[in-house]
Amino acid sequence: MAQELRNITISAPGFLGINTQDSPIGLNPAYASVADNCVIDQLGRVGARKGYELLTTNGPAVLGTSDGICCILEFISRANVTTVFSAGNNKIFTGITTLVEVTLPVGYIITENDWKMISFNNNVYFFQVGHAPLISTAGSTTLTELTSSGSNVPPAAAEAIAGFGRLWAADTATNKYTVYWSSLLDGADWHGGSAGSIDLTTVWPNGYDEVVAMSEHNGFLLVFGKKNILVFSGAESPNASLTLEDTIEGTGCIARDSIQSTGTDLIFLSTRGLMSLQRIIQEKSLPLNDISSNIRTDLLASLTQEIQANGHRKAIKGVYSPVDAFYLLAFPESQVVYCFDVRAPLENGSFRVTTWSAVNPRGFSVFADDSLYIGRVNGIVKYDGYLDNEVQYQMRYFSNPTDFDTAANLKFLKKFNLTIIGGQSTQTTLNWGYDYTSSFQKQEFTFGSSSIAEYGLTEYNTDGEYSASIIIQTPKVNSTGNGSVVTVGIEAQINNASFSIQKIDIHALLGRLI
């Protein structure tokens, strides 16, 4: 007796992001096993990330064989003059198109590129462990060294922030347990006025810890150790009223530049994964939430690789883009960027996550116009368009293996109906495989191509449907083979056009019981 042809629909494939932590069988089909060079677009679909445009023209000449630009800061003076500072190859630069070295104090030697650049009170301050702090007055390209009378000289600290009307610094080469603060509105004075410091050795809840990072959040000064977080109130007048309000034990920050504020949350990397410190104004409580639980094993493997290769975590960078509604966490050694969609958490508290490859960022900065700029080996690039420096890049989506809730039957796939948004002139490959194989059957086709005579491509919608200049592509692809579980994948060579996966319809016959 002939079996009835069934239609199986994967609506919004990958909508829930990657999940490599849970068992794939029985997992919601809206999860993906692979979503590389993808974002969750504004309509909740998996789509291609944007590309990048190289802006710097003299990168190789000034950056040599170094890691490239490792940090970027846009400074806007009170006179409304914009200066972009960046650092790499043991140099500090101004400019974007042409990187021009700043003038350093006579005899000043830079040995690392792990600068913390801070805009404060119409000046830019430069802090790095083992280096005397520097200042650019009102955006000047001539930097001077911070000096102070007395014994309390400006700390040569790895971490520094601006908050509560002053600068705060911690983590020097010889002291990782003291937090220093400058005088009010004077980032150059660390000795007189209202400057001061606090020793945290008796404050940590679980014995000795080391300061890694600091942040101002919800009216508190947060001090992040490697294993604990200290919450201080009264930072507006620290010499008189700095008070330990709360401690969060067992979770700290292990990468200074992973800390990013989203306005309502504070995101940071810990030994347990990527964490969110949620803001509740009424109670001023600070609950923790692991937002990387769906990929925790993969993320921690990237972290381990970073430590094994470099012996530290300084190269790990994070950034929050409000206009794109994502948080990026880059691991240079494994050449992967995790892209977390921060619009809303999933039911388990995790954020939807995709990955990026081939970008290889060394630093991030979001400018005043909300544009995302990235430091790379060859200079400064802008996150924009759908080419990587005029070169195509590959977007990859693969489902988790699924039995379509009929575990006892063989599945004979007959035809795929795809609904793709965008994708003009995009070379695309449909993949399908059975029973956990990594060897997929493939069908290639190109949207916008006049040639549709490839095997298995039975119908091709060349006109599509248009809405606000976005084309809707609906190719239909014949398929073969059978198995008990099925994996589906789409690979697309992004070619200067957006590409989002709306829906995958599968026509299948259910066979005998296994």
Where are these regions (language model features)?
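Beta-sheet repeat architectures centered on beta-propellers
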Residues: M1-T97, T103, Y108-N122, G250-D265, ...
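Asp-box/WD-like beta-propeller blade repeats and closely related beta-sheet repeat scaffolds
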Residues: A138-A162
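A short beta-strand motif characteristic of beta-propeller blades
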Residues: L55-L63, V100-G107, L143-G150, I198-W204, ...
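Carboxylate/His-rich catalytic cores and anion/metal-binding grooves
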Residues: A162-G187
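Short loop/turn positions that demarcate and connect the beta-strands within blades
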Residues: S66, P154, N206-D209, C253
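Surface-exposed extracellular loop regions of Gram-negative outer-membrane beta-barrel proteins
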Residues: L221-I248
